[in-house]
Amino acid sequence: MADDLGLDLGKKKKSKKVIKIDGDDAPVETGVEAVEDGLGELNLGAKKKKKTPKTAGEEVVEEKVPTLEIGIGAQNLIDAKGAWPDYTYEEALTLVYQVMKDKNPDFAGDKKKFAIKLPEVARAGSKKTAFSNFLEICRLMKRQDKHVLQFLLAELGTTGSIDGSNCLIVKGRWQQKQFESVLRKYIKEYVMCHTCKSPETQLTKDTRLFFLQCTNCGSRCSVTAIKSGFKAVVGKRAAIRRAEEATAGK
């Protein structure tokens, strides 16, 4: 039908706009084509990088960013290789221990742990407690049984003795944790070195004082004397009272 009527229903083409300037016979064209014609051979595309030619027998070496070494050997905060990194407290403490181990290789190893056997406790009758491996623990601590027994009875505030089967019989009802607590206190005071915490020590007596001599670090210090604990007066109260009244009446 459009052909019969002679109509053109297609898209209308844009016509070039021509601007005439007074005094100039040549028309000026506008639009994209005019701009492109004016630029000529000017190329506004991305500039390509030029590749450097490789010569025969030459290897390409990549430049690596230098990393800061640990700051142990540096004398100042800023050394020849650059500034120290910011260390946290834990990292700085690790560096200090590392320097100490490097300067003192003898103390670089782990500390030896001193372990003893647990007390073997059982009932001995209705009012007594048997400590069967008392002498064995004394040998492990390398201490005289008389000294350990004196400290044990003073801390518990009771009486006791070693029977014929080398078993300690203590008056009263006691549990294993109570004997263990007293032995820990004894080890801390009379076995472990007060300077380096080593169990390799010797307990010696000079005049009336006891001294703890360490074979590891060589330190020597005095230890406290054993003091008797609280002792309850159970019997003979009437006799004691009469004796006090008799002395007061005189």
UniProtKB/Swiss-Prot annotation:
<comment type="function">
    <text>Component of the eIF2 complex that functions in the early steps of protein synthesis by forming a ternary complex with GTP and initiator tRNA. This complex binds to a 40S ribosomal subunit, followed by mRNA binding to form a 43S pre-initiation complex (43S PIC). Junction of the 60S ribosomal subunit to form the 80S initiation complex is preceded by hydrolysis of the GTP bound to eIF2 and release of an eIF2-GDP binary complex. In order for eIF2 to recycle and catalyze another round of initiation, the GDP bound to eIF2 must exchange with GTP by way of a reaction catalyzed by eIF2B.</text>
</comment>
<dbReference type="InterPro" id="IPR045196">
    <property type="entry name" value="IF2/IF5"/>
</dbReference>
<keyword id="KW-0396">Initiation factor</keyword>
<dbReference type="GO" id="GO:0001731">
    <property type="term" value="P:formation of translation preinitiation complex"/>
</dbReference>
<dbReference type="InterPro" id="IPR016189">
    <property type="entry name" value="Transl_init_fac_IF2/IF5_N"/>
</dbReference>
<dbReference type="GO" id="GO:0031369">
    <property type="term" value="F:translation initiation factor binding"/>
</dbReference>
<keyword id="KW-0479">Metal-binding</keyword>
<keyword id="KW-0963">Cytoplasm</keyword>
<keyword id="KW-0863">Zinc-finger</keyword>
<comment type="subunit">
    <text>Eukaryotic translation initiation factor 2 eIF2 is a heterotrimeric complex composed of an alpha, a beta and a gamma subunit.</text>
</comment>
<dbReference type="GO" id="GO:0005829">
    <property type="term" value="C:cytosol"/>
</dbReference>
<dbReference type="GO" id="GO:0002183">
    <property type="term" value="P:cytoplasmic translational initiation"/>
</dbReference>
<dbReference type="GO" id="GO:0008270">
    <property type="term" value="F:zinc ion binding"/>
</dbReference>
<dbReference type="GO" id="GO:0006412">
    <property type="term" value="P:translation"/>
</dbReference>
<keyword id="KW-0648">Protein biosynthesis</keyword>
<dbReference type="GO" id="GO:0008340">
    <property type="term" value="P:determination of adult lifespan"/>
</dbReference>
<dbReference type="InterPro" id="IPR002735">
    <property type="entry name" value="Transl_init_fac_IF2/IF5_dom"/>
</dbReference>
<dbReference type="GO" id="GO:0040014">
    <property type="term" value="P:regulation of multicellular organism growth"/>
</dbReference>
<dbReference type="GO" id="GO:0003729">
    <property type="term" value="F:mRNA binding"/>
</dbReference>
<comment type="similarity">
    <text>Belongs to the eIF-2-beta/eIF-5 family.</text>
</comment>
<dbReference type="GO" id="GO:0005850">
    <property type="term" value="C:eukaryotic translation initiation factor 2 complex"/>
</dbReference>
<dbReference type="Pfam" id="PF01873">
    <property type="entry name" value="eIF-5_eIF-2B"/>
</dbReference>
<feature type="zinc finger region" description="C4-type">
    <location>
        <begin position="193"/>
        <end position="217"/>
    </location>
</feature>
<dbReference type="InterPro" id="IPR016190">
    <property type="entry name" value="Transl_init_fac_IF2/IF5_Zn-bd"/>
</dbReference>
<dbReference type="GO" id="GO:0003743">
    <property type="term" value="F:translation initiation factor activity"/>
</dbReference>
<keyword id="KW-0862">Zinc</keyword>
<protein>
    <recommendedName>
        <fullName>Eukaryotic translation initiation factor 2 subunit 2</fullName>
    </recommendedName>
</protein>
